[in-house]
């Protein structure tokens, strides 16, 4: 192929990418917790996983991964992790069950605090949130870097484990509370899970348990229909910083 043809094809490809709004969002994870966290990533819609699906992040360390556009998925932090004599890697909270540091397309086992991001969903607009719908294991926040529009940070900075009701508590061997179940996970009742026949906002209002999450972290999803102040938007192809223990 002639050099001019190669150059033309390259230019056309770049133009298509530019005008279609393609933008790889840089997602940076920062660990402000006093202990090591093992972030996990999961791409939704049965799309290819990111280049990093799980890794170790020491206290005060940061690491980044690129997410293509469009993209949708979730992020979480595993804690109290170890490798046994047989080489199997497990975590006491938010484990993904892969037996490895990499999650390889497996999601977090609840309870787990989640950050959810959808990149370039409608007309290039991003949606993002912190969710306690699957319970809580550690504080998290997500903040756009750049972009246009509101682009406000979403955060759950409180340690919900400290106020977790007894029926929702998950304890370590030493008796300390290490995560807090959602009422849905703890009881399996449709009034907590917002499943039929309680699968509308009208038939699945907040409960005494979701209101504990709401009080501690008003910017986060406390249960399935907590949309009013929990979904955030940003346009213009921002990058994101996800912080553990913000």
Curated annotation (Swiss-Prot):
Residues 1-24 form the signal peptide. PROSITE patterns: THAUMATIN_1, THAUMATIN_2. It comes from the Eukaryota. Keywords: Allergen, Disulfide bond, Secreted, Signal. GO terms for cellular component: extracellular region. Disulfide bonds join 33-245, 81-91, 96-103, 151-234, 156-217, 164-180, 184-193, 194-204. It is found in: Secreted. Belongs to the thaumatin family. This is Thaumatin-like protein 1a. It comes from Malus domestica.
């Amino acid at each position: 192929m002639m050099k001019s043809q190669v150059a033309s094809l390259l230019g056309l490809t770049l133009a298509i990418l530019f005008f279609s709004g393609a933008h790889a969002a840089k997602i940076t994870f920062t660990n402000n917790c006093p202990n090591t966290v093992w972030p996990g990533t999961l791409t939704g819609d049965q799309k290819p996983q990111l280049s990093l699906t799980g890794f170790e992040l020491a206290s005060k360390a940061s690491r980044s991964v690129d997410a293509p556009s469009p993209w949708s998925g979730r992020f979480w932090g595993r804690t109290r992790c170890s490798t046994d004599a047989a080489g199997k890697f497990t975590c006491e909270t938010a484990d993904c069950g892969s037996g490895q540091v990499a999650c390889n397309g497996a999601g977090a086992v609840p309870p787990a605090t989640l950050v959810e991001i959808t990149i370039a969903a409608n007309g290039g607009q991003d949606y993002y949130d912190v969710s306690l719908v699957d319970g809580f294991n550690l504080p998290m926040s997500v903040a756009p870097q750049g972009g246009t529009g509101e682009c406000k940070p979403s955060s759950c900075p409180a340690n919900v484990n400290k106020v977790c009701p007894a029926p929702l508590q998950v304890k370590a061997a030493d008796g300390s509370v290490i995560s807090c179940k959602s009422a849905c996970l703890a009881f399996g009742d449709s009034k907590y899970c917002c499943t039929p026949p309680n699968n509308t906002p009208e038939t699945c209002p907040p409960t005494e348990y979701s209101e504990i999450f709401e009080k501690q972290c008003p910017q986060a999803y406390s249960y399935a229909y907590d949309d009013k102040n929990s979904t955030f938007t940003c346009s213009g192809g921002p990058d994101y910083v996800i912080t553990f223990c913000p």
